[in-house]
Amino acid sequence: MARQHEILGMNARNFLFQGRYNRLRSKRIADSKLLTKQVLKQAKLATPKLYKQFKTESKVDQFDLTKLPDSFVVKPSQGLGGEGILVVDKRDDDGWLAVDGRRLTTQDLRLHILDILAGRYSMLDLPDRAFIEERVRVHPRFEAIACQGTPDVGVLVFNQVPVMAFLRLPTKESHGKANMFQGAIACGIDIASGVTTSAVRYTDEIKFFPETRRKLAGITIPRWDEVLELAVKAAEASGLGYCRVDVALQPRTTKTGKLKSTPMVLEINAQPGLKIQLANKAGLLSRLKRVEGLKVKTVKQGIEIGKQLFSVREEAESIEGGVIRVGIFEDIEVVDIFGDRHPLKAKLDTGAFRTSIDEVLAKKLGLMDPENILWERHYHSALGREERRVVGITFYLKGKKTKTAASVTDRSKLKRPMIVGRRDLLGFSIRVKESEAGQEA
């Protein structure tokens, strides 16, 4: 569970991140779903197809609702918390059926749209715009763990880095809405793998979907890398430095019968809630501080930083496979930029947080390639102000593969060109051999 000093509170969110990194123009984009759609379309990012939008009552009266597809969604442009969203499942005689089983006539739909225009669901209690868009179906991966509505994935993006994510599952209690305050379930997601780790309902941890024995941990999110890429690009397109991007997977079957899915942005939230921390059992503040100020040059780099920094390495999983005994000095294999392994001797140092590698060796292995440099940090030492790069690295220790981030340093005067820090030693038990006791690094 997260420590108190790692948790992000509302005041810190508003002052340190939302207020500092979100410009007013960008907030206005996020506050309007229609404006968000326009910006995403210009950036060529996927979002549900827009069928019709309404600005005035006369436009509602003039439009022939019977020309709509069998299934669609009616939304307010500036709604809050899922209020005012009406999901139509299919046609029924001379009307439609909503996902909650209600029968809807043409007049029912018109009245609902007019309520939206009157500002009934507006976050500002002001007249709003209504629109009708493509309905995103439930992906087969989630059919057994969702009720009535479509699950979505919320990715919190800061400084072009995905720092935390959750899967929201509608329930019977939430009436098909992915709203945690109404009873929807939130599952924390490991950024590195796209696999759910734990789940909460309101503030209580749960292990199974209600009224079933379906486990909520261990669910793999389809097309995870594409979801992350879409989220980071959407945040970039909106101009928001700190936001949550909600993504849904639109499933479809190809002519050959294969299942394909397309990640689509549902909306962008410039003031994301804080319950994502409960779902992940982790604090946002510590994660945000780790990426604040980093110079992220590309979307790919931002995603790689998020994966390296915030991967979940469950201790239980390590113990299941048995604790691996090692000494202070061990032979390891480091993978170069082409995927080939190179043997070398390394020191296992629990006193160091991060793994580090000699600069000359890193260059030789191709790890200093610009595409592989995760970020650069400046720090002060006895020699003055110095720059240190952090690169992506993969190595094998006692047959166990570890993909991590390593600091690049000058170790030319030391015996071993690499140190493995405690961050990458989970599942290992270090035993000091008598012959190692007096040796230097």
Predicted features and spans:
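Active-site nucleotide/adenylate-binding loops and adjacent lid/helix of ATP-dependent enzymes
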Residues: L8-N22, S26-D152, N159, G351
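A short acidic-Thr-Gly-centered motif at the start of a beta-strand
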Residues: Q62-K67, A237, Q250, T254, ...
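Short, His- and charge-rich active-site/binding loops that engage polyanionic ligands
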Residues: K75, I85-L109, F158-E205
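A long amphipathic alpha-helix within ATP-dependent nucleotide-binding catalytic cores
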Residues: G119-C147, H175-T253
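Short, surface-exposed charged micro-motifs
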Residues: G154, D246-A248, K345
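A short, polar/proline- and glycine-enriched secondary-structure boundary/capping micro-motif
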Residues: E173-Q182, K275-N280, G366-D369, L414-M418
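C-terminal active-site "lid" helix and adjoining low-complexity regulatory extension at the edge
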Residues: G218, P222, L249-G322
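Pepsin/retropepsin-fold aspartyl endopeptidases
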Residues: R290-A441
